A protein has these predicted regions:
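ATP-dependent carboxylate activation and anion-phosphoryl transfer catalytic cores
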Residues: 1-2, 13-15, 27, 58-59, ...
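Short, basic interhelical loop/turn and adjoining N-cap
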Residues: 370-379, 421-433
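Internal, active-site/partner-interface "lid" segment
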Residues: 33, 66-71, 254-256, 262-274, ...
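ATP-binding N-terminal substructure of ATP-dependent carboxylate-amine bond-forming enzymes
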Residues: 1-60, 69-76, 314-315, 432-604, ...
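Extended, domain-scale alpha-helical bundle/helix-rich regions
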Residues: 409-412, 418-422
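Transmembrane helical cores of multi-pass secondary ion antiporters/exchangers
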Residues: 35, 39, 52, 65, ...
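Acidic/histidine-enriched active-site and ligand-binding environments that engage anionic O-linkages
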Residues: 76-85, 620-629
Length: 991
C-alpha cells in the first residue's frame, strides 16, 4: 500500500494510467497522492481544450484550433480554419492517430482513426503551421517555484515532422539571442502556470520571417526529448525530477558530474549535438517512407562534436544502415526537375537529396523555398559537399592530398574509408598519412559547465584538433564493453540490458570499465554506469581511436548484439584480446561447413541444407531438398531478408531483394520442417553448462522467434525431448568452447529434435529468462569470462528446476504507425517491443500477456476468417471455439464452405474485387473485432490480402496471421478470469 504514486517517469502510459485511476476515484479512496505532478496539471497539459484555455489565460499564442469529438464537427472546423490542418488526438503517444490533412477526404480518414485512438475521444483540429521552425525547450521546476532551462533543441525539419523522426540539434543553431530569450521566458511561464514540479518539455513553432511563435504542445512528464537533453548536457533530468517529486529544491540537489555545483545551475554546452532517427524501412520494403506527425522511428543515435558538420557525419555512420556520408544514397539518375520535385518529399533520405541538389549547383534559395530548411543548415551541408569535391579532385589527379586538406576533412569527421574511396587510395594509406602528420582523434569532456568546474564523472566525445582530455585514470585492468547502437527491429533494448549488467559485474570483479555506445535512450549511456563512457559511432575506425588512448586489456562483444559481434575482427587486428568465447568459435557457429562438421562430430541432426551464392545454385538446392525451403543470408540479426520459398519464382524474388542490400556473405537454403520451436539460453564455463530454463514458441516454425509468443517453462514437450535438448546444448557448448553465453533454437518434431540456429552470445530472450527464473544470467556469464566456474559461483550445472508459475512473453507491433507495411508474420522479424504475462496458470498468463500487448477483446463479437486451403481443416476447431464464446463469423468463400460443412455457422462475404458490400466494407464499417487471415506462402500471396490487413490495422482491428496465435487467443477468451492474481517476481530470485 504505497503512500504516493509518481506518474511522470513512465511516459504516456504512466500519465494515462494515473488519470484513469484518478477519474475512477481510486487515489482518493485509498488515500494515495500523486507526486511530481497533480491530476489537474496533467489535464491542463493533455486535455486539448484545457490546454488551449490555460495558454490563452497567460497570453501564450497557440495555433487557431478547435476540439472535436466526431467526424462531422471536425470537417466543419477544418473548413472554417482552412486547409491544410493538423489533427492531434488527446492522450496518445508518438502522435498516434494524428496527421496533416490537405483536403476533406484526408481529414475524415485521419479524424476517424484519431477519435478511436484517443483515450477520451477528442481530436484537436488546428491551423497547419508546417514550414515554421520547430524548437523545443526542456525545463525543470521545483516545489518552491525555482525554474531553469536544461537545454533547448532545434529540429532541422520544419514543423510537420514528428520530433521523434526529425534530425534534432542541441543547442539550437539558428536562433538569435532575442528569439532564444523570448522562447525561454515563455517556457518558464508555461511550466510555472501549469504548476509542474519536475521536468517538462515545451514544443514551439517559430515563424522564420518574424518573431511570431506559437506553442505546439507541452509534455508534463519526462519524455523521449528529455532523454536526449539529459545525454546532450550531462544533466540527469529524470533523477532530478524524482528528487524534486520527493520535496527537494534545485539548490539542494548536487550536480553528479561536477560534485561541486547544484542542479540550479543551467548546463552550458561548448559543443554541438545531433540526434538522428533510426527508421525501420529496411525491414518494411513496401512501407511508405514519408514522415509526418505520426512517429515511425524505432530508435535513435546521438553524436557530439565541436562543429555541426562533424556531429552530423558521426550520426550518419552511427545509424548502421550502410550509410557513411552524404553520397550513400544515389540520386544521379534523377533529372533536375524531378530532383526539385523530390525535395518536396519529406522522408528519411531528404538530406541526401539536398546534398545531390547542392552538387548540381541548386541555389540555397531554391532548396530553402521547397524544403523550408534554414539557410544555415543548407550552408553546412554545402561545406560537406565541397569537401567531397576536393577529395574527388585528389582522386582524379587534379590535386594532391595535403596534410591541410586531410586535417580539414577529419575536422568535419570524414571517416578514413570515405576519404580513401573518394581519393582512390587505401584506408591504410590514409591512416598512415594521418598518423605521420599527427592528425589523430582527441577526446573532450561533457561536463555540464563548459569546463568552468572540474568534472568527477565526465563522458567523452572525439574531435580532431585541440588537446586530449581523456586522462588515464587507474592502474586497474581495463575492459572495453561494446554497446548495441540504435534500437531497431531485431536488436532492441534487450542487448543494452546485457551490456549494463555485464559492465556492473566487471566493476565488481575489479576491472576499470569503458563503454562505447551512441544511443541516448539507453541506460548504458548514463554517465555513472561505467568508469568511462565514450559517446561514439560503433565503427572500426572510431573504436580504434579509443583503443589507441585507453589500451584495454580486453574487449567483450557477446553482450552488444550483432553490432558488437561485427567489430570482432577489427578489434583482433588492433591487438585487443576478445574476452569469453574465442572469435574463431563464434565464426564456426556462423560458417555453414564448419558448423555442419561440429554437428556431425556431436551426432546432432539439423534440417538438411546447402550454402549457395547465386539464384541458380539456390534453385538447384531447393529441388534437391524439395519445397518448401527456408532461404536466408548468413550473418544477420532479426531474420533480415529471410523467407519461406515454395517455388522457383520465390527464390528469384528473394535473391533480387538480397542483392539490393549488398550481400557479400553466402546464402543458406534449408529444408523447412513444421514443428514446435524451442529456445534455450545457457551459460558455459568451458566444462559445465547451466540452463536456466527452456522456452517454447506458441507459433510453429517459420515465424521469427522475436515475433512468436514465448512460454516458460515449455508446456507440451516430453521428458525425452527435454533430455535431448539438454544433451545437445551441453555437447554444442563444449564443442564450440563457449565461455559465457550461448543461445540455441531447436525444432521438435515428435521424438526428433533438430538444431536450427546457434549463437554463442547473448540473445533477445536473456532479460526475459533472467527475470522469470531469477537467475542473473549476464552477471554469471561475465564472472565466468573473468575466470570463475559455475560451481564456484554456487550453482549446480544442468537444467535448473522449473518455476511454479507460467511466464509468457508477447510481441508488440507498431503496424498502425508504419503505413504500407505488410503485417503478415514470417521468418523476418517485425515486432518493435514485448510485454510479459505471469500467472499460476497458462490461461491466465496468456490473458495477461494479450491485455498487456493492447489486444483487448471482445467489443462487437464479430470476426472475419480467411484461411488458405491447406489450413482450413485445422481452422474448423478454432472457429468452433470462437463461436462458442459468442462470436459471429464472416468468412471468404472457401473458408465459409469448409466451416458450414463442418457445422460451424459462417456468413460468406464477397472478395475485394466483387461488388459492395464486400470484405473491405465490413472491415471499414467498424463492426469487426478480429480478423484471422492466413496468407498463402511465397509468390502465391494475393495483393487483396495485403490491402485488407492494412485497412484492418489502420481502423484498429486486431489481425492474426497465424493459426497458433488464433488458438492461443481463443484459449485466453475461454478462460477469462474475473480476478487476476498478482505475482511478485522479486520473490522468485534465485540470486
Amino acid at each position: 500500500k504505497p503512500d504516493s504514486v509518481l506518474p511522470t517517469l513512465g511516459g504516456q502510459a504512466g500519465l494515462n494510467l494515473a488519470m484513469e485511476l484518478e477519474d475512477a476515484g481510486f487515489f482518493k479512496e485509498h488515500n494515495v497522492r500523486l507526486i511530481g505532478t497533480t491530476a489537474l496539471t496533467i489535464k491542463k497539459a493533455e486535455d486539448r481544450e484545457m490546454f488551449k484555455e490555460t495558454m490563452e489565460k497567460i497570453g501564450e499564442p497557440v495555433a487557431p484550433s478547435d476540439i472535436v469529438e466526431d467526424v462531422k464537427h471536425g470537417l466543419e472546423i477544418a473548413e472554417k480554419i482552412g486547409y491544410p490542418v493538423v489533427l492531434r488526438p488527446a492522450y496518445t503517444l508518438g502522435g498516434s492517430g494524428g496527421g496533416i490533412a490537405a483536403n476533406p477526404e484526408q481529414c475524415a480518414e485521419i479524424l476517424e482513426n484519431g477519435l478511436r485512438l484517443s483515450r477520451v475521444g477528442q481530436v484537436l483540429v488546428e491551423r497547419c503551421i508546417a514550414g515554421w521552425k520547430e524548437i523545443e525547450y526542456e525545463v525543470m521546476r521545483d516545489g518552491a517555484g525555482n525554474v531553469i532551462t536544461v537545454c533547448n533543441m532545434e529540429n532541422i525539419d520544419p514543423v510537420g515532422v514528428h520530433t521523434g523522426d526529425s534530425i534534432v540539434v542541441a543547442p539550437s543553431q539558428t536562433l538569435g539571442d532575442k528569439e532564444y530569450q523570448m522562447l525561454r521566458t515563455s517556457a518558464l511561464n508555461i511550466i510555472s502556470e501549469l504548476g509542474i514540479t519536475g521536468g517538462c518539455n515545451v514544443q514551439y513553432a517559430l515563424n522564420p520571417d518574424s518573431f511570431e511563435y506559437c506553442v505546439i504542445e507541452v509534455n508534463p512528464r519526462v519524455s523521449r526529448s528529455s532523454a536526449l537533453a539529459s545525454k546532450a548536457t550531462g544533466y540527469p533530468i529524470a533523477k532530478v525530477a524524482a528528487k524534486i517529486a520527493l520535496g527537494y529544491t534545485l539548490d539542494e540537489i548536487r550536480n553528479a558530474v561536477t560534485k561541486k555545483t547544484y542542479a540550479s545551475f543551467e548546463p552550458m554546452l561548448d559543443y554541438c549535438v545531433v540526434k538522428m532517427p533510426r527508421l525501420p524501412f529496411d525491414k518494411f520494403i513496401s512501407a511508405k517512407r514519408t514522415l509526418g506527425t505520426q512517429m515511425k522511428a524505432t530508435g535513435e543515435v546521438m553524436s557530439i562534436c565541436t562543429n555541426f558538420e562533424g556531429a552530423l557525419m558521426k550520426a550518419i555512420r552511427s545509424l548502421e544502415q550502410h550509410v557513411d556520408c552524404l553520397l550513400s544514397y544515389d540520386f544521379t539518375d534523377l533529372s533536375d526537375e524531378t530532383l526539385e520535385e523530390e525535395l518536396n518529399r519529406v522522408d528519411d533520405m531528404r538530406i541526401w537529396r539536398i546534398a545531390e541538389a547542392l552538387r548540381r549547383g541548386f541555389t540555397y534559395e531554391q532548396i530553402h523555398d521547397v524544403t523550408k530548411i534554414d539557410f544555415w543548415f543548407i550552408d553546412k551541408l554545402a561545406i560537406l559537399v565541397e569537401m567531397e569535391d576536393a577529395l574527388k579532385a585528389v582522386g582524379s589527379g587534379e590535386k594532391s592530398l595535403t596534410a591541410e586538406l586531410l586535417a580539414e576533412a577529419k575536422r568535419i569527421e570524414y571517416p578514413d574509408n570515405v576519404i580513401a574511396r573518394l581519393t582512390g587510395t587505401s584506408q591504410e594509406d590514409i591512416k598512415k598519412l594521418r598518423y605521420d602528420n599527427g592528425i589523430r582523434a582527441v577526446y573532450k569532456m561533457v561536463d555540464t559547465c563548459a569546463a568552468e568546474f572540474a568534472a568527477e564523472t565526465p563522458y567523452y566525445y572525439s574531435c580532431f584538433g585541440g588537446f586530449n582530455e581523456a586522462e588515464q585514470t587507474t592502474g586497474r585492468r581495463k575492459v572495453l564493453v561494446l554497446g548495441s547502437g540504435p534500437i531497431r527491429i531485431g536488436q532492441g533494448i534487450e542487448f543494452d540490458f546485457c551490456s549494463v549488467h555485464s559492465t556492473w559485474a566487471f566493476s565488481r570483479e575489479g576491472y576499470e570499465t569503458i563503454i562505447v555506445n551512441n544511443n541516448p535512450e539507453t541506460v548504458s549511456t548514463d554517465f555513472d554506469i561505467a568508469d568511462k563512457l565514450y559517446f561514439e559511432p560503433l565503427t572500426p575506425e572510431d573504436v580504434e581511436s579509443i583503443v589507441d588512448i585507453e589500451k584495454p586489456d580486453g574487449a567483450v562483444v557477446q553482450f552488444g548484439g550483432q553490432t558488437a559481434i561485427k567489430l570482432t575482427e577489427a578489434l583482433m587486428k588492433m591487438g585487443v584480446p576478445i574476452l569469453g568465447t574465442a572469435a574463431e568459435d563464434v565464426d564456426a557457429a556462423e560458417d555453414r561447413e564448419r558448423f555442419d562438421a561440429i554437428l556431425e562430430q556431436c551426432n546432432i541432426p539439423r534440417p538438411a541444407g546447402h550454402t549457395v551464392f547465386t539464384a541458380e545454385e539456390a534453385k538447384e538446392a531447393a529441388h534437391k531438398l524439395g519445397y518448401p525451403v527456408l532461404v536466408r543470408p548468413s550473418y544477420v540479426l532479426g531474420g533480415q531478408g529471410m523467407q519461406i520459398a515454395i517455388s522457383d519464382e520465390d527464390i528469384d524474388e528473394f535473391i533480387g531483394i538480397i542483392n539490393q542490400i549488398a550481400q557479400e556473405h553466402p546464402i543458406l537454403v534449408d529444408k523447412y520442417i513444421m514443428g514446435k520451436e524451442i529456445e534455450v539460453d545457457a551459460i558455459c564455463d568451458g566444462t559445465d553448462i547451466l540452463i536456466p530454463g527452456i522456452m517454447q514458441h506458441i507459433e510453429r516454425t517459420g515465424i521469427h522467434s522475436g515475433d512468436s509468443i514465448s512460454v516458460y517453462p515449455a508446456q507440451d514437450i516430453t521428458q525425452h525431448n527435454i533430455d535431448t535438448i539438454v544433451d545437445y546444448t551441453e555437447k554444442l557448448a563444449r564443442a564450440l568452447h563457449v565461455k559465457g553465453m550461448i543461445n540455441i533454437q531447436f525444432i521438435v518434431d515428435g521424438d526428433d529434435v533438430y538444431i536450427i540456429e546457434v549463437n554463442p552470445r547473448s540473445s533477445r530472450t536473456v532479460p526475459y529468462i533472467s527475470k522469470v527464473t531469477g537467475i542473473p544470467i549476464v552477471p554469471l556469464a561475465t564472472r565466468i569470462i573473468c575466470g570463475h566456474t559455475i560451481r564456484e559461483l554456487g550453482y549446480k550445472p544442468g537444467l535448473q528446476p522449473a518455476a511454479d508459475y507460467i511466464a509468457i512473453k508477447m510481441p508488440v507491433f507498431s503496424f498502425e504507425k508504419i503505413r504500407g507495411a505488410d503485417i503478415s508474420l514470417g521468418p523476418e522479424m517485425k515486432s518493435t517491443g514485448e510485454c510479459l504475462g505471469i500467472a499460476k496458470t497458462f490461461n491466465e498468463a496468456l490473458y495477461k500477456a494479450f491485455e498487456g500487448a493492447g489486444i483487448r477483446l471482445p467489443k462487437y463479437k464479430k470476426m472475419i476468417m480467411s484461411v488458405r486451403h491447406s489450413d482450413q481443416e485445422e481452422a474448423v476447431d478454432i472457429a468452433r471455439r470462437f463461436a462458442a464464446v459468442g462470436y459471429q463469423i464472416f468468412a471468404t468463400r472457401g473458408t465459409a464452405r469448409t466451416l458450414n460443412k463442418n457445422g460451424v455457422k459462417a456468413y460468406e462475404i464477397r472478395k475485394l474485387e466483387q461488388e459492395s458490400p464486400n470484405i473491405l466494407d465490413l472491415v471499414l464499417g467498424h463492426q469487426i473485432d478480429l480478423i484471422i487471415d492466413i496468407p498463402a506462402q511465397g509468390a502465391e500471396r494475393s495483393h487483396d490480402g495485403f490491402i485488407i490487413r492494412r485497412n484492418a490495422i489502420e481502423t484498429g482491428v486486431n489481425v492474426l496471421t497465424s493459426l497458433d496465435t488464433a488458438n492461443a487467443l481463443v484459449t485466453s477468451l475461454e478462460n477469462r478470469a474475473k480476478e487476476l492474481t498478482l505475482i511478485d517476481i522479486a520473490t522468485v530470485k534465485n540470486a
